[in-house]
Amino acid sequence: MQRAYESSSFSRLAGRALACAALGVGLAGCPPAPPASQFPTADDALGRMHACYDCALGVQGTAKVDLVAQQGRVKGDVYLFAVAPDRVRFDVVSPFGATIYTLTSDGRDFKLADQEQKTFFYGPATPCNLARFTQVPVPGHALVSLLRGEAPVLVHTREAASIRWDGGHYLLDLPSTRDAEEEIQIGVHPDDFDKPWQEQRVRVLGVKVVQQGIPLYEAELSDHKPVTTAPPRIDEEGIDDPVPPSGPECTAEIPHSIRFVVEHTEDDVLFQYKDGEAKWNPPLIEGTFTQPVPGGMRRQFTDCDRAP
């Protein structure tokens, strides 16, 4: 059985090489052939994706952010926490070291301290409130998933979902039961092409969501690298006990470059994790996902999902 498998694998690779040579496209001209063992269904591929991130409950990291929106462009560093299912914190610092924004959401309450406008926005943790900073109208759980490298998955039926190999990666089409469609690009780890599909590690490369025929957002994920679990948080004065990591040991990959694009508004935001700065399952202290009103700021309630 092993000899037959190796012969089949050799024939597949040889056939691909001959096809590339015949077309005269050179070494880089042909996309990778599909793995020897392929996912039977879209849900099988999604199951492997979830399995690869079972240990990654949340991420803490420092990233470069480059946000291009109708209101202008913002560049700086962002210190972020994103913890499943829907808790986030962003502290955005300018190139000069000044804090520009602090956004917190515990999945229920949204708060944004805008130092430039001297305004403290607060309200429910709706997609459009989160988009005040991210410019991407996605729910908190979807944002957390993408920042961890996992695709949010729309509600769908197994029978309606489809999967095919398309130019070096899998392409999953998920017609939702709620008048939406999702397209997910999933790649296979280069070291796992000859493993059974049940053992292959996968990488989410792209996500596109369309709502009622209108493109909602696209996400491009690249530069995948393994990272480790964060160490315990130690009180330097030795008064409080160490705070342990919020999850198990984990060495899953994370995409170090995540780009969000919203076609109808032309908004574009790029997160690039700094090497060595991203950690899984960070220690969490009370108040991480909320914030007090800074002095000297006016308060403004916002609930843009609610009709006037």
Predicted segments, located by residue:
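An acidic-aromatic
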Residues: D86-A142, F271
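Gly/Pro-enriched, hydrophobic low-complexity segments
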Residues: A160-A307
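Extracytoplasmic
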Residues: A56-Q60, K75-D77, V83-R87, A98, ...
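Beta-strand-dominated lipid-handling architectures at cellular/organellar boundaries
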Residues: T62, R73-Y79, P85, P215-E218, ...
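Sec-dependent bacterial lipoprotein signal peptides
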Residues: M1-C30
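N-terminal leader/targeting segments and the immediate start of mature chains
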Residues: G29-D77, V243, T302-P308
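A mature extracytoplasmic/lumenal domain signature
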Residues: V65, A84-D86, V92-F96, G107-D109, ...
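Scaffold/interface architecture of coatomer-like assemblies
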Residues: G149-V153
